[in-house]
Amino acid sequence: IVLVNDGSTDENSLNIAKEYTLKDKRITLFDKKNGGLSSARNVGIEYFSGEYKLKNKTQTIKENSLIEFNIEGNNPYEIYTVYKSYKAFNNEKDLGNFTYPNIDYIIFLDSDDYWELNCIEECVPRMEGVDIVWFDSIGKIEIDKYNDWYSPLKNYFYKKAQIITPYTWLNDSIKLNIKGFYFVWLGMIDFKYLKSIKLKFINSIMHQDHHFGMLLFVQAKYIYIYPKSLHIYRLRDNSTINMHNIKKQDIPPYIYNIFVSFNENMYLTREYFSVFSMHIILIECVKFLNKYNNEVLNSLFKKAFFELLIVKIFRIFNFNKDPKNIKKNMKYIYRYK
């Protein structure tokens, strides 16, 4: 289990994470600079991939204490400290030998959300021979205007457990007029598969689960559809999708210049940042498809999802300011319009 404290301005959040880490030796806690959801998730991927070298800062093991580690060398996300419970080590020699565990599968969970108690047990046996298990989610919405949220799986009307291919997924998307897709906490992923396609989350944007989900599914061999609700999605005031009510001190650093450009209007900042994020996502999808050697899937992918991405990007013309120079970099869009 990996917990990531992404530079929370609420110190109590880190303290709570430390309490859980102390109690459960399975947990590894990363405390890092605020970099957003993508960077937090990428820390987990990179840790389990063996991309970090850990050096113990704590020299002696004391009961009821946390063992602290530093990252040596490559530390792109500015991880301050890595914490582990004393229970995970038998002696001081173990501290110097601590490294990442080998995992078969990875599953993501945001701090607001939670799983049904049997989620992992339900997923693992269904991972046999597939790259992804895609399950359903129930919304627990605390904001009135998002009360109509429902999970992407429901859009596809899959009523029974089945195994599909990317061809089926894309053809169903087109047939059912599903123009947008996202995936991150809605299932379990084979970790060898994830590493083999070298897919990570785009840093410093929102809607990163759209890019991640689309590229994850289109490259899969088989996807297990499990239309059972194993996840509870909570939407609260400071969720990324509802940045309108975020406090000034909680604004991520990669958004701050936009916030200033729009005279500290959080609504305009959020709307512009959404356009910018879709712009980056489309660019990265185009780059991927230009290298992906499957003409049929490439064509289906564009037909299914490019229209909505382009429509959302064209909202840029609703703004009289353009701090990220989106309008100057839109020539690539017109070939797909």
What are these regions (language model features)?
Residues 1-257:
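Nucleotide-sugar donor-binding/catalytic module of glycosyltransferases
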Residues 234-337:
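C-terminal subregions of glycosyltransferases and related glycan-biosynthesis enzymes
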